Amino acid sequence: MELLGSTLTATYAHPPPASASFLPAIGTITSSYKDRFPHRNLTHSLSLPWRPNTYYKTAYNYPTLAPYSSRSQRVCESTMLPFVSNRTTFFTRYTPDDWYRSNLVSFQESNSSRHNSERLRVDTSRLIQDKYQQIRKTQAHSTQNLGERVNDLAFWKSEITHELDEMIGETNALTDIKRRLERGLIETEGPLQVSRECLFHREKRMGIDLVHDEAEKELLAEVDTILCCQERMRQHLDKANAQLASDRSAQHELEKDLSDKQAALRIDDKCQHLRNTSEGVSYFRGVERVDATVSVPETWAKFTDDNVLRSQSERAASAKLREETENLLIVTANEMWNQFNKVNLAFTNRIAETVDAKNKIHTHLTKTLQEIFQIEMTIESIKKAIKEKSAFLKVAQTRLDERTRRPNVELCRDMAQLRLVNEVYEVDETIQTLQQRLRDSEDTLQSLAHTKATLEHDLAVKANTLYIDQEKCMSMRNSYPSTLRLVGYC
């Protein structure tokens, strides 16, 4: 509603004009300054004679009230603005009672202020002394706490230093056993190469000597043994590398924690010895409101304790691995040496068998050669005998042939004729028998020659086998590494 003015008996107001007015709506102005300036009722002090009695006033909208009507409702007296036109005469501002009351109030306020000031002075003096003692006590407690903190830091520093020394020693020991394991693994390559070379050379055996004998079985077992030992050594080498990484990680955490402890110890020791007269003390505004802490005493102690426990656990695992590696080196060296001895024993037995077989073959070959010589002599004697018997046969047959020329009745089957016929048959049968014996002897000679060739071939085979086993294989196996080298010592 727009307020137009008032008289002694009435107040005039009507709804705001249409939007054709050049002034903005009061509601718009009110909404644009909402919550900026609180609503205040105009007082009498604003109604001065020189101010106009018609003006605009910021209105406040009460949504729970009914629309304003000049007929049914009147303007509330608390919201009515006084105007100069309402005054009938000039009036004074205060009464004598107000004046006395004001003086009394001033005196009372003065007494109260002085009393409060005196009490404040006494309380302040007492407060200064109390706070001074409290601050000194607080500073002493802080110094004591810093001293306890320094002691805790020194204790954990000594624990970390001791554990760090132990870890460094364990790491060095594990590094040494790892180097021995690497050297032992390298040393196994030589025996493995020797075993494979022996198998390769024995493949060059000839004929029946290319047999899967005990020596070859032991050589294959030696290769398997060495490969198995190498695999176990590689596995322990991988474990050693992993354990070294864990040890170095734990050592790094200890070194980092030790470095932090040393820095904190220097700082807290410096803070403990700071006094009010010390150099370097200054104001650092707001530092107490900055909470840069990342732990509490429990988690702080647990952090270092966990690092120490982790280091101890890694050291125990490292010591166990070292013991296992040491045992592995000894066991693998013994296994390889035992198998090496088995192979050598098998070679020795096989060489002895081959030498014995070779000697027997040589004996049989000698006898065969002798028999060949004898059978050749027999063949010559048979041929000579056949030749001699042929002369008797020719004489007998010539006699018979001559007697066939006897004339007429002289061709008598007399005793001489019968004897000559029997002689021819007898000599011819003898020659046939000798010729059969000659053929048999020649067949026997051929068989003996074949046997001789076979024995000579077998002798060459045995000689080749002996050369391979005795000269090549056994000579290579003389360079087998010692037990000390197999366990990693130079």
UniProtKB/Swiss-Prot annotation:
Coiled-coil portions: 415-461
GO BP annotations, alphabetical order: cilium assembly; flagellated sperm motility; regulation of brood size
Cellular localisation: Cytoplasm, Cytoskeleton, Cilium axoneme; Cytoplasm, Cytoskeleton, Flagellum axoneme; Cytoplasmic vesicle, Secretory vesicle, Acrosome outer membrane
Segments crossing the lipid bilayer: none
Signal peptide residues on this chain, from the entry's feature table: none
Keywords: Cell projection, Cilium, Coiled coil, Cytoplasm, Cytoplasmic vesicle, Cytoskeleton, Flagellum, Glycoprotein, Membrane, Ubl conjugation
Modification after translation: N- and O-glycosylated.
GO terms under cellular component: acrosomal membrane; acrosomal vesicle; axonemal A tubule inner sheath; axonemal microtubule; cytoplasm; outer acrosomal membrane; sperm flagellum
The organism's place on the tree of life at top rank: Eukaryota
Tissues showing expression: Expressed preferentially in testis. Expressed predominantly in late pachytene spermatocytes and early round spermatids. Expressed in spermatozoa.
Family matches, as Pfam families: Tektin
UniProt topology in membrane: Peripheral membrane protein
Glycosylation sites: 7, 9, 11, 41, 86, 111, 276
Main location: cytoplasm
Assembly with partners or alone: Microtubule inner protein component of sperm flagellar doublet microtubules. Interacts with TEKT1, TEKT2, TEKT4 and TEKT5. Interacts with CCDC38.
PANTHER family assigned: TEKTIN, TEKTIN-3
Function per UniProt: Microtubule inner protein (MIP) part of the dynein-decorated doublet microtubules (DMTs) in cilia and flagellar axoneme. Forms filamentous polymers in the walls of ciliary and flagellar microtubules. Required for normal sperm mobility.
Recorded family membership: Belongs to the tektin family.
Name assigned to this protein: Tektin-3
Source organism (scientific name): Mus musculus
